[in-house]
Swiss-Prot record:
Its cofactor is Zn(2+). It comes from Yersinia enterocolitica serotype O:8 / biotype 1B (strain NCTC 13174 / 8081). Keywords: Aminoacyl-tRNA synthetase, ATP-binding, Cytoplasm, Ligase, Metal-binding, Nucleotide-binding, Protein biosynthesis, Zinc. Gene3D superfamilies: 1.10.10.350, HUPs (3.40.50.620). The gene is gltX. The keyword Lipid metabolism does not apply. This is Glutamate--tRNA ligase. Belongs to the class-I aminoacyl-tRNA synthetase family. Glutamate--tRNA ligase type 1 subfamily.
Amino acid sequence: MKIKTRFAPSPTGYLHVGGARTALYSWLFTRHFGGEFVLRIEDTDLERSTQEAIDAIMDGMNWLNLDWDEGPYFQTKRFDRYNAVIDQMLENGTAYRCYCSKERLDELREAQMTNGEKPRYDGRCRDSQCTHGADEPSVVRFRNPQAGSVIFNDKIRGPIEFSNQELDDLIIRRTDGSPTYNFCVVVDDWDMEITHVIRGEDHINNTPRQINILKALGAPVPEYAHVSMILGDDGKKLSKRHGAVGVMQYRDDGYLPEALLNYLVRLGWSHGDQEIFSVAEMTELFTLDAVSKSASAFNTEKLQWLNHHYINSLPPEQVAVHLSWQVEQLGIDTRNGPELVEIVKLLGERCKTLKEMAESCRYFYEEFDEFDADAAKKHLRPVARQPLEAVKAKLAAITEWTTENVHNAIQGTADELGVGMGKVGMPLRVAVTGAGQSPGMDVTVHAIGQARSLSRIDKALAFISEREAQQ
């Protein structure tokens, strides 16, 4: 049997982390078995569905490199197919027209709740022989079995059973002629030959209804797997108040797609004590029976740890591609400065996100207006004039601008003055970067460049002179 799964988001908002994890699990399951992965946009909610949300879903999938073999399919383009199936069901008696008014249904619901009963349709029109006018508004309901039960073996949770007495006759077409979500899903899964439905646990109650419709249509019933929800660090369902945002916000915040994928796969799935997984490893090892039934808590610190790992373990050229987007957002012109690959090598150990890296690399490309106040107060004092002038002379004398020669100039200055490297390195660091922290001075000064470094040392010496004049 060829495995075929689908990811079927509703375009009413951004692709959030829960949806991204569901997409990842479906994608991994399919790729593990060499099957096919379908992208389907369930846009039947015409009032809430937006093109912006569709674009955000597509952007998120592409950024995460979760490619699809079919689609994207749009339910709004398949209404003729859904209605043709409904008409066929009306003919063979597996569906019927319901003329109950909204007022009657509201009264029924209120009475049932008052009596402590579960609100459900009472079947008044199910076997009614009453005649109604052709123009009288009606919906179409599925004639759900009234006896027996629906049992399915959830691939994550095990056997789940629903009594048919608990399921009412689902509306499958509204009064305006549009098919409903639960029905469209069934026809899509049937037509697209979906073998495994992997989705969030909030869909468990939809499953018995969908299975009954599939059986009424004589369609094969796929396997189902329902993934547990993601919680915030307070134990409550992850939401916007926890900072939960669309997947692309993680891109904007400087996370690598490899880090987010690694984090999401471990958010409910495990393989021993292993924490780091390449996409190839995930694909090889992923199984549904290793997915936990329990909810998982989102931990931003863990994601940052993984991101730091990938910043420093992926090829610098690959990381630099993502960094280039970050520096563009900050308006940094990198044409006059080191290649971004060098920035990744220089700042990788110091940064948890690429946004942090982009913000930290400005001094390699742009002049700064002022020195960090604390760093200047501590290191750009009159006593720093001699080492700065001496190291400037040695840097200016370099004819072949290499990291080794820069290092020798700094070390040579310290040796000649008979002081520790810090007495030269710290004033030099503040002079050329404007701050008190940076990578090693030899690699930093080399990356900034000879002319720019000398100019900044002059600026620092002028700052010291102004400071002396004010004392």
